[in-house]
Amino acid sequence: MMSDLPLMELKDIHKSFGNVDALKGVSISINAGECHCLLGDNGAGKSTFIKIMSGVHQPTSGQIIINGQETEINNPRDAIDVGIATVYQDLALIPLMSVSRNFWLGRELTKKVGPITVMDFEKCNSILMTEMDKMGIQLRDPSQSIGTLSGGERQTVAIARAVFFGAKILILDEPTSALGVYQTSNVLKTIERVREKGVAVIFISHNVSHALAVGDKFTVLSRGETLGTAKAGEIDFQELQAMMSGNKELSVLKK
């Protein structure tokens, strides 16, 4: 369910690399159960902004506020500790390993077999199948190679993994990039399911139609600056597309 109170706010975020200003006063807020789409063409500053939220980079100036408290995110561990998980385009999956091993990936449940500690495959596989079923994916076998899954299914595994391990704020970096129509539809359905769990989703994209399908709010970035934010229903495809391409400014985004 969507909350009225911001789960995370980023206020007036600046990031400079030497003399290059990558971000110039970017601000967004996101509530629990909300999908906030961050749109922009290549070079808009989306990747830098993701890395600040996920602790890879630290802002030159600005505030990060989590649950009403100003928070320092100095590294990826800090981000994880406050409930921020990022699913990058490469998904952090190992193609030749099983779906189950990819899902757990260093956090396996274990059991004792005599003096030896081993992965509890039965329990791990059972949880995996349950979590994937919640996301609308029926796996043939948890031991099958993750490389045998479609792109959309692999994306869903990465999202399900992040949610299972406690993500309250889920950052999705171009999750529908290079996917076909059917696979894209499945990923967008997965995002809806995640929102229903109360997880806040930050959907990074340059695809306006995909963003409009799931977004509650839309923020457009251009050359490191926020051009503004609009809620669903306040803006249409043509306006967003024109803003992203730099052809016009939108009064609704300036309000």
What are the roles of these predicted feature ranges?
Residues 2-255:
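Glycine-rich phosphate-binding loops of nucleotide-dependent enzymes
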